[in-house]
Amino acid sequence: MKKNFFKTAIVGLASIALLAGCGGQSSSGNNSTSEKSGEKQVLEFYHGYHHSESEWPVAKVMRDLYDKFAKEHANGNVEFKPIPVNGDLKDIMKNKVASGEFPDVIDLAGNAVSLAAIEQQLVLDLKPFIDENNLQKNVGLNYEQNQKDGKIYTVHEQLFTMGLWYNKEIFAKAGAKTPDQWKTWSDFTEAMAAVRKVDGVYAYGTGEPSIRLFNTLLGMSEAGRKLLSGPLTKEAIESKEFSEALRMVMTELQVNGSKNAGGDANAYSKDFAEGKSAVFFNGVWASGEMAKNPNLQPGIYPGGVAISSSGGGITISSKMSEEKQKLALEFLKYMTSDEVQKIIFEKVGANPSDANINVKEIAEKSTDATTKLLGQAISQVKEAKSIVPTISDVWGGDVHTAIINALTESAAENVNIEQKVKATQDILKSLIN
């Protein structure tokens, strides 16, 4: 789903436009004048795929999918109108919510659901429709991760799926264990120590990507995974699992050094492509560029941990006529259909939400190098010992940013790790109060 394999998911999703929102019960109130007068109604769908085909081919693929749905329903009483937005879709959402409304249909592009929209009951609960139409497998991870208090307010048709990428040639030169051999955290740190000894090579770039290691350590234990299953609390922050994860990541980052700390994954993409670093923390969407160099291979994190989140996606207003709501739900069904989900995998280059799609089988039969590598990367994630959601998806952007800042700062040689762990815990406790 990304414009550039070097982009992190956060940057990539921002390029598709950031937004948020959701909540509520079905209602036919607040109909427009045209709806009341019998004129053809318009169902507006806001999305961020505004880019030209030459700038980002994926955007054209997505627009074609939307246009196909519009044509298939052109003879109905409701016109489906996709609206590409070159800007921040959050502004559209915020303005609507401020006036007690919500866009007819909007793609959250991975962003969290608006609590204000939930509280005002502005967004439709999608779970009844999903259950009635047996779409549980089609929506996949969304059914579990996006279900809050028995309701599902948003469904993302493609998943934010993270493993990592490594240069097998560098690992061979270093005699280091490859990711498939990282049974413990020590296996990982020892491999990184080995690749640092190769002339002209550093292990990995940190900064924003460092939070993937914290995410991983929590995912390696049952207690840590339990922390990732709910809101961040004072007790969670003070827990042994949380503090130990901070301590272990900070210690490793300090060994890795401050020279390659700071920024997002984009800051280290060029070095990885040129063989100057051994590991690149990025998602499965990177397959397109990785396929150009056979030395660059996908892997998952220590202890067989992978990271995958549904995040926000198709979100529907609860304040529409029954006809508009019906078409909106048909659009949800269409975007999570096997036919469309196969295109999401093969043409968009993303991990489809639909559990019915056998990406491994499709990849093995394909002659396309990118599809083959993408299938390999996604299959590794699906077969991981543990799959955990992202920190930002579970605990929000503020906590996500605070942890990244703390981890980045810990890379400096003069930082006292124990003091940094305590200071980070204090900052996080102040954020949740």
Describe each region flagged by the PLM.
Residues A109-M162, T189, K197-D199, N295-G299, ...:
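Hinge/lid segment of periplasmic solute-binding proteins
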Residues S37, S114, L122-V123, G288, ...:
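Mature extracytoplasmic/periplasmic domains
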Residues N4-I16, C22-V113, E323, L327, ...:
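Conserved N-terminal structural module of periplasmic/extracytoplasmic solute-binding proteins
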Residues E72-N138, K173-G175, S269-D271, A278-V279, ...:
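Extracytoplasmic "Venus flytrap"/periplasmic binding protein-like
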Residues K372-L428:
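C-terminal capping/gating helix-and-loop segments adjacent to ligand/active sites or protein-protein/ligand interfaces
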Residues L213, N295-I316, S366:
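Periplasmic-binding protein-like
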Residues E190-A194, L232-A261:
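Glycine-centered hinge/linker elements that transmit conformational signals in sensory
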Residues D149-E157, M162, A172, S186-K234, ...:
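Extracytoplasmic/periplasmic solute-binding protein
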